[in-house]
């Protein structure tokens, strides 16, 4: 009996394999150590390998593709319904093997090392931004206990902290001033690292054609363009711009039944980092439209009819569709083109 389909449950050191033949009969069910993984698959004829899209999955997918196997990654949430009972590595591998053969299953494209490297820059940048915010908020909270209110803005906060460290505020004890100095130096160090990361993203942007074309869209900056280009391996996996917007969680949640359509809030499913970047970018466009309604009359009209946040999400939905069109068709943004707003 020849193995045609394998379900592979990944882990750090011990991997579980569940293989079946063309009739669905179990041929192999075994665990492998990390060092045994590639030698095991080298001996097999080319077959279909299903893997949950989790940590290290893209690495192993690339390695197995080099050996001639067809590898398909699946979202873990879509594999879970095929687990019959209990939670074991063997049960998970069997569920993966069953799920990968379903004709309606949705798969995750395998990312290249370059894409994963770019995404690691974004993950690090997002972490450092959060840490910088936490540090500044810590300084604000500490000084508030001594009756000192720090103005908004990073530069103002660091300037005020420096004045306190230099002893220009006698109301702050020496011990507290030392802590403020430590925190302000940490915030400054993080800020310097963020500037370095932004320069790395600018270099990656110049070398990537897709990211450069996405930069032509209003509201999409270097961070958003590089994140989208690195996250979307194949735009043709989506049938339309609406499906791409749904993948980002920017479409209404449907609870329709009996022929009656019921739409709720946006689903907020998918990559929340990409969704956040889109919404933040559209927030800037909405703010500009409020200051200059003649610049975008249709957005100004939408703001007159809908709450600000609703209009912002509608713009993010519209922009997601434009992004898909540009990525799928290899075009750049046409300034005169005005697709319908999703209100």
Language-model regions, residue ranges each:
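A detector of single, family-specific signature residues
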Residues: 1-343
